[in-house]
Regions:
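Short, intrinsically disordered, charge-biased short linear motifs at domain edges
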Residues: 45-58, 98-109, 255-258, 384-389
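Iron-sulfur cluster-binding electron-transfer modules in prokaryotic oxidoreductases
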Residues: 3, 128-495
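Non-heme iron-sulfur electron-transfer modules
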Residues: 38-50, 74-107, 125-154, 450-459
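Cysteine-centered iron-sulfur cluster-binding motifs in ferredoxin-type domains/subunits
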Residues: 54-74, 102, 106-126, 366, ...
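Low-complexity, intrinsically disordered or signal/transmembrane-proximal segments
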Residues: 13, 37-40, 489
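Extreme N-terminal basic, low-complexity initiation segments
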Residues: 1-12
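Compositionally biased, low-complexity intrinsically disordered regions
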Residues: 11-13, 25, 33
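Short terminal hydrophobic/aromatic SLiMs and anchors at protein ends
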Residues: 5, 16-18, 23, 39
C-alpha cells in the first residue's frame, strides 16, 4: 500500500468515526463479579466452533481464582467473563457445543491483554497463554467484530510494522507533536471529536526528533575496547520512530563493553504486533523475512539482541511459529539478559559515574511473564554508583499498553495506565526504567511530569558518559566517587 493511499484510508476512517454513533463502551466502574457461570445473554450452540485449540491446555484449571487478582482486564471490568477463569469456562462450553462464538462472547476475549500474568500466578500450570494465542485467529475467522473495529485494526497492521509507512504518516505531525499546538488541541477537547481510538493515538504521540525519520546508526559498529564478541541488533519498528535514543544508547553500551554491533539496514518487523492480534499469516511472513535478514550477516554472531520486550517475546517463539523450518543461527536474547550473562567489562565499570536518583522499576509483561526476565535489569542497574532502585507494589500487573490494546480498547487501557502510573509514582522515584516501547509511551502519557521514563540502557549509557538523558538534574554524573567495585559511591565535593 502506498503512503498516499494510507493517508487517504486514515482520513476515511476518521470520517467514519466522527459520523458514527458514540460506541457503547464498557463501564470501568466495578461491576458485580460473576460466579463462573456463563452469562445469560450468551447464545447456546449445538457444535464446537473452535477446532484446533491446544489439547489439554485448559485441563488443569480447577477454577480456584488465583488468576483473578493478577488479571488486568478483571481489574478494571470486574466481570467473570473478562477473566482467565471465565474465558476458559467459555472455551470449554464452545468446545462442548454448548455455546456459540457470537459477538458478545468474542468481546470478552478481545478484552484480554495477553499479559500472561495469570500464567505466572496459576498454581495448576494452566497454559492460558497457549489458549488465548490459539483463540485470537479464530476470532478473526468468526467475523464477530464490527466494521469499524476490523478497519481500524487492519489500518494499524498496515502501518505499524512498516517504519517507512509510519514515518510517512508522521511527517505532517512534526510541527504538531510536542508543541503548544498539541497542548491546545488537547485542552480544547478537539482530539475527542475523532473518537476514543484516534484520541488514544494522539495522547500517545511523543515529540518527534530528526532521528525518528531515518536510521542513522551505521551497519557495523566496532567494539570500543578489546573485542569480546559480535552481535546483531533489532531496531524495532515503533521504537526506531518514537524513541530512537534507545537503540543509540544500546549500541554505545555494547560497544563500550567490547562488542561489535551489526545492524542490517534492510531489517524489517519481527511480527510482534500482528502476532499479538492473531494475524498468523502476516506474522509468519515477517518472521521468515527477519530470519533471512539476520542469517545473511557475514561472519559468526554470539547473539541476535532485542531492546524491546514485545519483540523479544515473539522472536523467541519463531521455532513454533515457523514450525522449525527456519531459525536464527544465533540465540535471540534481550540485551539486558545478554549483558547480565556476559557481565560488564572492567573498562566499562570504571566509566560508570554516579546517578544519585531514585529509579522505579517497571517490569513489562512480555519480559517478566513472557520471558521470565526480572532479575537481570536490576542486576545491571545496581552497578551504577548512587542509584536507588524502587519497586512498585503491583509489579506484575499490566500497564495497559499490551501491543495495540491501548488503541483498540482505549478506555480500559487508560484506567490501567492510571493505576500503574499511580503505583510507580507512589515509590517517590523521579525516573522509571522501562524496557518496552509500548509501555514507555503508555507510562509517559499517564505519569506526565511526575517522573521521566527511560530504557535501562539509556540509564547505563548516561552513567558511562555516553548519552544525554533528559529528566536528570544538572550535574548528575559529575560527582567524585569513593570506594571500589560494588562499593563505589558518590561523595560530596566542594563547590
Amino acid at each position: 500500500m502506498r503512503c498516499n493511499d494510507l493517508a487517504k484510508a486514515l482520513f476515511e476512517q476518521l470520517k467514519i468515526n466522527i459520523g458514527r454513533p458514540e460506541a457503547k463502551s464498557k463501564a470501568l466502574a466495578v461491576k458485580p463479579a460473576g460466579s463462573g457461570q456463563v452469562s445469560q445473554n450468551l447464545t447456546m450452540a449445538s457444535s464446537s466452533q473452535l477446532p484446533g485449540l491446544p489439547d489439554g491446555a485448559a485441563d488443569p484449571c480447577v477454577h480456584c481464582g488465583f488468576c483473578l487478582p493478577t488479571c488486568a482486564s478483571y481489574r478494571v471490568l470486574a466481570s467473570e467473563m473478562d477473566s482467565p477463569r471465565g474465558r476458559i469456562h467459555a472455551l470449554r462450553a464452545i468446545e462442548a457445543g454448548e455455546l456459540e462464538l457470537d459477538a458478545t462472547v468474542a468481546s470478552h476475549f478481545d478484552t484480554c491483554l495477553g499479559c500472561y500474568a495469570c500464567v505466572s500466578a496459576c498454581p495448576s500450570g494452566v497454559r492460558y497463554d497457549q489458549l488465548i494465542e490459539a483463540t485470537r485467529p479464530k476470532l478473526i475467522e468468526a467475523g464477530q467484530r464490527n466494521p469499524w473495529q476490523v478497519a481500524f485494526r487492519q489500518l494499524l497492521l498496515q502501518v505499524l510494522p512498516y517504519p517507512g509507512r509510519l514515518r510517512a504518516l508522521l511527517q505532517p505531525l512534526r510541527a504538531y507533536a510536542g508543541t503548544p499546538l498539541q497542548n491546545l488541541a488537547r485542552c480544547s477537547g478537539l482530539t475527542r471529536l475523532f473518537g476514543p481510538e484516534i484520541e488514544a493515538m494522539e495522547q500517545l504521540l511523543p515529540p518527534l526528533v530528526p532521528e525518528s525519520f531515518s536510521d542513522r546508526l551505521p551497519t557495523i559498529n566496532p567494539a570500543r575496547s578489546s573485542r569480546r564478541g559480535r552481535v546483531a541488533l533489532l531496531l524495532g519498528c515503533v521504537q526506531r520512530c518514537f524513541d530512537p535514543a534507545v537503540s543509540t544508547a544500546t549500541v554505545k553500551v555494547l560497544q563500550a563493553n567490547g562488542f561489535e554491533v551489526v545492524i542490517p539496514p534492510d531489517q524489517g518487523c519481527c511480527g510482534a504486533v500482528s502476532h499479538h492480534q492473531g494475524e498468523m499469516e502476516l506474522t509468519r511472513q515477517l518472521a521468515a523475512n527477519l530470519v533471512r535478514c539476520m542469517n545473511s550477516i557475514e561472519g559468526d554472531l554470539d547473539a541476535v539482541l532485542v531492546a524491546a520486550s514485545g519483540c523479544g517475546h515473539t522472536m523467541k517463539a519463531y521455532g513454533e511459529l515457523l514450525a522449525g523450518q527456519q531459525q536464527f543461527l544465533a540465540p535471540v536474547l534481550d540485551v539486558q539478559e545478554f549483558l547480565a550473562e556476559w557481565g560488564f567489562s572492567e573498562e566499562f565499570r570504571k566509566q560508570l559515574r554516579p546517578l544519585p536518583a531514585a529509579v522505579a522499576m517497571h517490569d513489562a509483561c512480555h519480559m517478566i511473564h513472557g520471558q521470565g526476565i526480572q532479575a537481570q535489569p536490576r542486576q545491571l542497574l545496581r552497578a551504577i554508583p548512587g542509584i536507588s532502585l524502587k519497586e512498585a507494589i503491583e509489579a506484575g500487573v499490566c500497564c495497559g499498553s499490551a501491543g495495540i490494546y491501548n488503541l483498540v480498547q482505549p478506555e480500559e487501557a487508560a484506567e490501567l495506565g492510571r493505576i500503574k502510573a499511580d503505583d510507580l509514582s507512589s515509590t517517590g522515584a523521579t525516573l522509571v526504567a522501562s524496557a518496552n516501547i509500548g509501555c514507555t509511551l503508555q507510562l509517559r502519557r499517564h505519569l506526565g511530569d511526575r517522573a521521566h521514563v527511560h530504557h535501562p540502557m539509556e540509564l547505563l549509557a548516561a552513567s558511562a558518559g555516553l548519552h544525554q538523558l533528559p529528566g536528570l538534574a544538572k550535574g548528575i554524573g559529575a560527582a567524585e566517587i569513593a570506594g571500589e567495585g560494588e562499593n563505589r559511591q558518590p561523595v560530596e565535593t566542594a563547590s
